[in-house]
UniProtKB/Swiss-Prot annotation:
Entry protein name: GTP diphosphokinase CRSH1, chloroplastic
Superkingdom of the organism of origin: Eukaryota
Binding-site list for Ca(2+) 1: 486, 488, 490, 492, 497
Basic residues biased stretches: 19-39
Disordered as annotated region, ranges: 1-68
Pfam families recorded: EF-hand_7, HD_4, RelA_SpoT
Lineage, opening ranks: Eukaryota, Viridiplantae, Streptophyta, Embryophyta, Tracheophyta
């Protein structure tokens, strides 16, 4: 997620008679500077719009229109493109696009001031997590707006009137969930389990997922809290929210919540596990890559498998620090007995042919036979959930392989074999398998929750489904951001349409005219799709440069601090001012 591109704008001109009052009016006494009336290329406009305006203690400096309203448009378009790009094709309908666009227009001016853009960055990071989980536009919109709602920058009435009742309902439910742990006097296993079941039974499942994304963002930025609060929050997440993430099928999110909680609750133990796993990963990386290549080639070369499978992918598997700790400490295993240090997952996509319904299981078993011919299978360790699925419907074939060589002992390699459909069922939002990891061991309870989740998803899909007649204009438009700005559907963005979005963002008509002048290459007074796409390309370039700058800054800060602490360099703040600080 590009965080640098979401840095809040400086004071923004509000001229043009805004359609809505915003909570952050222009500071009195500051007047915007005008750009020279020169014909500038699109990259100059994007650079002016996307880069952060310089700030100083002097009250005489203010933002240019391109640095104000134009920059907000760049943020709006960039964020919109990223979120719709993360959503699946089936989710990014034109109805969904309109909803996301409205949510971003409401959130951007509400979050642009106050803390250097951190609130806006958090809101967009949460929205990106929800998009990665393939949630619908209502949930993603609620994720965008929750930060502004918590800060008091918008009200629930604003959400209802400008976004919709369904999104407001999700926000209301997530706020109730936020305070659910306060109902517990003691956070023991029994109480935590009861609270998890209560949350899954009495709250909107999509609001639960929204709250999980919020907790993940909180855990990623826990360093800013006092030590005792870090531990309290981490214990709460480990006992309640990480198992909830398993229960709703968000397995990767659950793993990250567990590992972050482990890191703050038991930092020394976490460091030991992390260093050991990193050493194992470094030592075995070339080995794993070699095994993946060998296996993939063997599967592709098999004639029998090629007849029933159209695609094969082999993935590595993330090594959970928390799970590894439990195996070593709770289960009492020795390091050499931790068998998923070397781990692969084979995902097969059977050919689409209704004449044979058993091609998926056949492909899994044929893959198993090929693996047996390549390596030594460990007797008694194979688990065939393809032929005999678990009660909750989980299907996969698990194999343990001995890859040791004479004089060179290695950990066992675990390989999971499943079809694409089985994989979706196992790790997606429809997987009852995850409900067991979430503490719901009753199959009937798991099936009931699955039915609730599917019903909620179907209801949202019906609301956001495109209507052929009303959405015909949008369906013919390939650039979703352009469609949202081209209100009348004539294939061009007029100055009136650009002014309208500027006013929605808290800027004004002067900013719109300035941005139009910068982007309108043929001077016809409007923006064509080609001119707008050139602007979009430059926005993405600026966002990627900001991302790289942020990464380089962190690397250099760490390296220069190390050098400075060793006494190898001395930097005088008085000489360099704020240009280079090594502390």
């Amino acid at each position: 997620m590009a965080t640098a591109a979401t840095t809040s704008a400086a004071a923004i001109p509000t001229g043009g008679g805004g359609r809505r009052q915003h909570p952050h009016p222009r500071r009195p006494g500051l007047r915007p500077r005008r750009l020279h009336r020169l014909r500038l290329p699109a990259q100059a406009a994007a650079a002016a719009a996307a880069s952060s305006p310089s700030t100083s203690s002097s009250s005489s400096s203010s933002s240019t229109p391109a640095e104000g309203g134009g920059r907000l448009v760049a943020e709006l378009v960039g964020a919109f493109n990223e979120l719709t790009g993360r959503m699946g094709e089936g989710l990014a309908t034109s109805s969904s696009s309109r909803l996301l666009f409205r949510a971003l227009k409401l959130a951007l001016p509400a979050l642009r001031d106050g803390d250097g853009g951190r609130a806006l960055a958090r809101a967009l990071a949460i929205a990106a997590s929800l998009a990665d989980l393939q949630m619908d536009a209502e949930v993603i919109s609620a994720g965008i707006l929750r930060e502004a709602l918590d800060a008091g920058a918008i009200s629930m009435r604003d959400v209802k009137s400008e976004i919709g009742i369904s999104t407001a309902h999700l926000l209301h439910e997530s706020l109730r969930l936020k305070h659910a742990p306060s109902k517990l006097d003691v956070l023991d296993d029994e109480s935590a389990s009861a609270l998890r079941k209560f949350c899954l039974s009495y709250y909107d499942i999509r609001a639960v997922i929204l709250e999980l994304a919020l907790k993940l963002d909180m855990m990623r930025h826990l360093d800013c809290l006092p030590r005792y609060l870090q531990r309290i929050k981490s214990l709460e997440v480990l006992k309640i929210y990480a198992p909830l993430a398993h229960a709703v099928g968000a397995g990767n999110l659950s793993l990250e919540l567990e590992d972050l909680s482990f890191r703050y609750l038991f930092p020394h133990s976490y460091d030991h596990i992390d260093q050991w796993l990193r050493s194992q990963e470094t030592e075995n990386k070339l080995l794993i890559d070699s095994y993946k290549e060998q296996l993939l080639q063997a599967l592709k070369d098999d004639d029998e498998l090629s007849q029933i499978v159209q695609d094969i992918s082999i993935q590595g598997r993330y090594k959970s620090r928390f799970s590894t700790m439990k195996k070593l400490v709770k289960d009492g295993r020795k390091p050499e007995e931790v068998n998923d240090i070397l781990a692969l997952r084979v995902i097969l996509e059977p050919r689409c042919d209704g004449s044979s319904l058993d091609w998926g299981p056949r492909a899994c078993h044929r893959t198993h036979e090929i693996i047996q011919a390549m390596w030594k299978e460990v007797p008694g360790r194979t688990k065939n959930y393809v032929t005999r699925p678990k009660e909750n419907g989980y299907q996969s074939l698990h194999v343990a392989i001995d890859v040791s060589e004479p004089g060179k002992m290695r950990p066992l390699m675990e390989i999971q074999i499943r079809t694409k459909e089985m994989h979706k069922f196992a790790v997606g939002g429809e997987a009852s398998h995850s409900l067991y990891k979430g503490g719901l061991t009753d199959p009937g309870e798991a099936k009931r929750l699955k039915a609730i989740m599917l019903a909620a998803a179907e209801l949202a899909a019906m609301r956001l489904r495109d209507l052929p007649a009303s959405d015909q204009g949008d369906s013919n438009c390939t650039n979703r951001a352009f469609c949202q700005l081209d209100k009348n559907g004539d294939g061009r963005i007029s100055i009136e349409e650009l002014t309208e979005v500027m006013e929605d963002l808290g800027a004004g008509g002067k900013d719109a005219k300035e941005l139009m002048h910068l982007l309108d290459a043929n001077s016809d007074g409007s923006l064509s799709s080609d001119e707008f796409e050139a602007f979009q390309r430059q926005i993405e370039l600026m966002r990627s440069l900001d991302d790289k700058d942020d990464r380089y800054r962190k690397i250099l800060k760490e390296k220069l601090q190390t050098i400075d602490s060793a006494g190898l360099i001395q930097v005088y703040r008085k000489q360099l001012g704020d240009k280079l600080l090594v502390s």
